[in-house]
């Protein structure tokens, strides 16, 4: 795992967009929205992965506008779904889900032999778990090279201190001793992650990252990087007009102390050196408001879209030993697990330590088996398990067996879909290739816009052409 990573256990993936007030909320609700999330390719997925991320992805993919044309809340706490007057049955979100294979290199560069195979295994589970290439764009990060180009450009404007202060970066350096994490790729992980996200923003379209509360700070880092990029390359001034308006020029200089002694001949270089720094310090909107008389000579356009977090509720999925479910702990149930293995593994699950003897009553609220009952069992079985535990009316072995029955019933259709894709691995590769082409079409449009904002080649070509 890395700093701000697309992780094995949960996706990354913010605060409000900053466009306050009721009118701002209504305006956002009318916008179309894209959803973006991904995972590092760690191979086959376990049920913790499913309920921690994949289940929410499938839900967002399948959400459609009802007959009123107003979408339901979909469980979001920050970025709610867009409310649009469109035909019933239309998807609420345009979903992009990917496998972050480049991110694996930040911590596992010493051995890359398993990345391709793990990526295929993970995509197979994406499909078995319910993601539909007809409804979502499913792609592989490394097949969209524009991610690397945008990462490069964003890295040029990202202060080193922003990356060094990321909490998970410091934690990883302190806690992960078996890997060498002192490399640029690991430090710059949040910048690549930002590129992954904002690549799929569009004009007039909200960009949403489903995330848990512990991952919101990662999206906020992306928002900070985007604001800085937009300030450098989205803030323009009409210098010719400003020079002709003495009052506006004086207003401009008075708000930037470093410009007060500058002559009009020096104003262009002085502007470039100071005004964008002021806009970064004050915030772009405050900066424009402070300009007062000179405000009309400034323009601002967002070259990249600031992402928003969609806080998603995820159920507790403890591992077989009661700790967080993780492959590294060996306490998982895979989506591909056989019935026999499920029964064997669940038979030795930890339970409420108070139930040392069959006759000892327990507390289902502290029992991992009961947590799993809440995921897979019917209400009738859930009530039976809770009552039996509290009264010692049932034993833990009996409770585990009943839970395993419901788990097997739930996992069987997922496993059957997986087996079908395993028989035809070329179909999985086809999904990856086709989805990556679709993602790249969007990415190429983004990069054309970004390149022009940074370098201005099209503007320069027009100037050259007009002078011939």
Which residues make up each language-model segment?
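Conserved nucleotide- and phosphate/pyrophosphate-binding catalytic cores
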Residues: 6, 72, 217, 223-467
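N-terminal Rossmann-like or analogous alpha/beta NTP/dinucleotide-binding catalytic cores
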Residues: 13-15, 29-36, 41-65, 85-197, ...
């Amino acid at each position: 795992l890395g700093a701000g990573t697309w992780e094995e256990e949960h996706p990354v993936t913010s605060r409000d967009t900053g466009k306050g007030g009721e009118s701002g909320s209504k305006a956002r609700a009318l916008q179309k929205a894209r959803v973006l999330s991904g995972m590092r390719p760690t191979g086959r997925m376990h049920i913790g992965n499913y309920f921690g991320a994949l289940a929410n992805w499938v839900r967002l993919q399948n959400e459609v506008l009802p007959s009123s044309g107003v979408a339901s809340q979909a469980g979001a706490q920050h970025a709610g779904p867009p409310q649009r007057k469109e035909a019933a049955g239309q998807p609420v979100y345009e979903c992009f889900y990917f496998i972050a294979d480049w991110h694996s290199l930040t911590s596992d560069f010493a051995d890359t032999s398993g990345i391709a195979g793990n990526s295929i295994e993970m995509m197979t589970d994406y499909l078995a778990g319910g993601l539909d290439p007809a409804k979502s764009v499913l792609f592989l990060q490394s097949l969209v090279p524009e991610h690397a180009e945008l990462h490069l450009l964003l890295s040029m404007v990202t202060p080193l201190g922003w990356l060094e202060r990321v909490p998970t970066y410091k934690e990883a350096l302190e806690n992960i001793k078996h890997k060498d994490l002192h490399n640029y790729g690991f430090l710059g992980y949040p910048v690549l992650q930002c590129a992954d996200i904002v690549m799929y923003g569009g004009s007039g379209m909200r960009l949403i990252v489903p995330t848990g509360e512990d991952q919101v700070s990662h999206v906020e880092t992306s928002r900070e990087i985007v604001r800085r990029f937009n300030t450098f390359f989205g803030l323009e001034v009409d210098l010719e007009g400003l020079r002709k308006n003495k009052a506006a020029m004086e207003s401009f200089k008075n708000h930037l102390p470093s410009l007060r002694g500058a002559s009009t001949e020096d104003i262009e270089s002085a502007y470039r050196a100071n005004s964008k720094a002021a806009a970064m310090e004050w915030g772009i909107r405050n900066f424009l408001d402070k300009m007062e008389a000179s405000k009309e000579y400034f323009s601002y356009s967002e070259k990249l879209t600031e992402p928003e977090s969609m806080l998603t509720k995820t159920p507790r999925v403890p591992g077989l030993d009661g700790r967080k479910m993780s492959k590294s702990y060996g306490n998982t149930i895979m989506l591909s697990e056989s019935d026999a293995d499920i029964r064997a593994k669940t038979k030795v699950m930890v339970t409420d330590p108070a139930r040392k003897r069959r006759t000892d009553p327990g507390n289902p609220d502290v029992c991992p088996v009961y947590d799993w009952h809440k995921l897979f069992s019917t209400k009738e079985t859930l009530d039976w398990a809770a009552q039996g535990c509290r009264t010692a009316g049932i034993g833990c072995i009996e409770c585990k067996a009943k839970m395993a029955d419901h788990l097997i019933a739930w996992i069987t259709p997922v496993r059957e879909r997986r087996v079908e894709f395993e028989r035809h691995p070329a179909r999985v590769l086809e999904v990856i290739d086709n989805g990556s082409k679709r993602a790249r079409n969007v990415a190429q449009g983004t990069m054309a816009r970004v390149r022009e904002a940074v370098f201005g080649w099209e503007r320069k070509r027009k100037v050259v052409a007009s002078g011939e």
